Amino acid sequence: MPRRRRSSSRPVRRRRRPRVSRRRRRRGRRRRR
């Protein structure tokens, strides 16, 4: 049976990811010896 969307009075807002600067994006970079 087809899935039904939840009926809500208010429109559903999609959560937007906070803007991440490209420079800061490399967080878990490992040092190679």
Curated annotation (Swiss-Prot):
Where in the body, by tissue, does this protein show up? Answer: Testis.
Name the UniProt key words of this record, in alphabetical order: Chromosome, Developmental protein, Differentiation, DNA condensation, DNA-binding, Nucleosome core, Nucleus, Spermatogenesis
User: Where does it primarily localize?
Assistant: nucleus
Gene Ontology molecular function: DNA binding
Where found, per UniProt? Nucleus; Chromosome
**GO cellular component assignments:** nucleosome; nucleus
Free-text function comment from the UniProt entry: Protamines substitute for histones in the chromatin of sperm during the haploid phase of spermatogenesis. They compact sperm DNA into a highly condensed, stable and inactive complex.
- Name of the protein this chain belongs to: Protamine TP17
Set out the biological process GO terms recorded for this chain's protein: cell differentiation; chromosome condensation; spermatogenesis
* Location of region: Disordered: 1-33
